[in-house]
Design a protein with these regions (language model features):
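Conserved alpha/beta-hydrolase "acid-adjacent" motif
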Residues: 243-249
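Conserved HGGG/HGGXW glycine-rich cap/lid loop of the alpha/beta-hydrolase fold
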Residues: 37-89
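Catalytic histidine-centered segment of alpha/beta-hydrolase-like enzymes
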Residues: 268-281
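Flexible "cap/lid" loop of the alpha/beta hydrolase fold
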Residues: 128, 132, 139-169
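Short beta-strand/loop motif that positions the catalytic acidic residue
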Residues: 230, 236-238, 242
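Active-site loop/oxyanion-hole signature of alpha/beta-hydrolase fold enzymes
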Residues: 77-118, 282
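Conserved alpha/beta-hydrolase catalytic His-Asp/Glu region
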Residues: 152-154, 172-228
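Alpha/beta-hydrolase fold catalytic core
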Residues: 1-50, 73-74, 112, 288-311, ...
Length: 333
């Protein structure tokens, strides 16, 4: 860990204005009727499909900086979780399982038999549940700032559960910018001011009520018992300076999943899609291979660091190895 609060960044950033301009030129927007809400989504790029699931107090637009760097390699698909405003979602009757069904509805809408999935923060719980439910449809996944079990502390429950009754956007929340500055601003140091303003403004579009319900769903979900049954290769990404989802959550996923590896994003916090999009895109690009060439249980000799006799894959009982991650940055066993 670095004592210096300034975070390191890769050179040559694409500034938010350019990201937005490219998004408007190149991305295709759509709406998927899941039967529970009208899901807004966009697709951007060509190649193997990669679906992005965002975290709490966020929208699909947060992934634009990293997707701008991946669109030449993947058909990137990002969607916004139910917000309960003009999308028809009845959040009071929603359950975490419904979020997973919404993901499958998007698969059906886009004609996806298989796709990679990246789940960020709260979105990682949706990705994990989907991988457990239909492993044949998600051959590999990436969990950034993820968790399988994150019950809220009493004060967190008090502060978030009450938001379920509030209309309006996150941008209207009192003292929001002060809170964001305390938690996230250090990892934007050294970057142009417009990058931080994009983070504040784009996340401000999420709905207050949606955050309240997302907090309730997160508090009630416990996927730890399902982890050993998730046999697909999983890349865990943890920001070195992430105080929102501390390292213990990544370690628990690493210990519980059948075939996972951990990469620590040096200098990053909880929102590397804003602060370190070049690094994040590079790690994603190197980990993933086309779904048609990546069976759900890959060949052990090609993927394990310690292949054993009789091993049929990283998840088989005879295999003691883990999936090696051909990525830059700091890799940890």
């Amino acid at each position: 860990m670095h004592d210096d609060p300034t975070c390191g960044h890769a050179p040559g950033p694409i500034l938010p204005a350019e990201v937005v301009a490219r998004f408007e030129r190149e991305a295709i927007r759509g709406v998927c009727d899941t039967g529970r809400y009208l899901m807004p989504y966009f697709t951007w790029g060509q190649g193997p499909p990669l679906v992005f699931v965002h975290g709490a107090a966020d929208t699909a637009m947060s992934f634009r900086p990293v997707i701008a760097r991946l669109s030449a390699h993947f058909r990137c698909i990002a969607y916004t979780l139910p917000q309960g405003h003009d999308d028809g979602a009845r959040l009071w009757g929603y359950h975490h399982a419904d979020l997973v069904e919404d993901l499958w509805a998007l698969f059906a809408h886009l004609g996806l038999e298989r796709a990679y999935v990246l789940g960020s923060s709260f979105g990682s719980t949706v990705a994990l549940a989907a991988m457990r439910q239909h492993p044949e449809r998600i051959p590999r996944a990436i969990l950034q700032g993820g968790t399988a079990y994150r019950p809220l502390r009493f004060l967190e429950r008090v502060l978030t559960f009450g938001l379920r009754f509030f209309p309006g956007k996150m941008a209207k929340l009192r003292r929001r910018e002060r809170l964001l500055a305390r938690i996230h601003r250090p990892c934007f140091e050294g970057l142009p001011e417009e990058v931080y303003r994009a983070f504040v403004d784009w996340t401000g579009e999420a709905r207050l009520a949606a955050l309240g319900h997302q907090a309730r769903w997160l508090h009630g979900i416990d996927l730890r018992a399902d982890l050993p049954a998730i046999r697909q290769p999983v890349l865990l990404l943890h920001g070195e300076r992430d105080s929102v989802m501390p390292r213990r959550h990544a370690d628990a996923l690493l210990a519980g999943l059948g075939s996972a590896g951990l990469v620590v994003l040096e200098g990053a916090g909880h929102v590397p899609q804003y602060t370190h999009p070049e690094m994040l895109a590079g790690v994603i690009r190197q980990f993933l291979t086309p779904p048609g060439a990546a069976p759900a249980v890959p060949d052990c000799a090609a993927t394990c660091t310690n292949p054993q006799a009789g091993c049929l894959g990283p998840a088989s009982p005879a295999c003691d190895g883990r999936v090696p991650l051909p990525v830059s940055g700091r890799r940890e066993p």
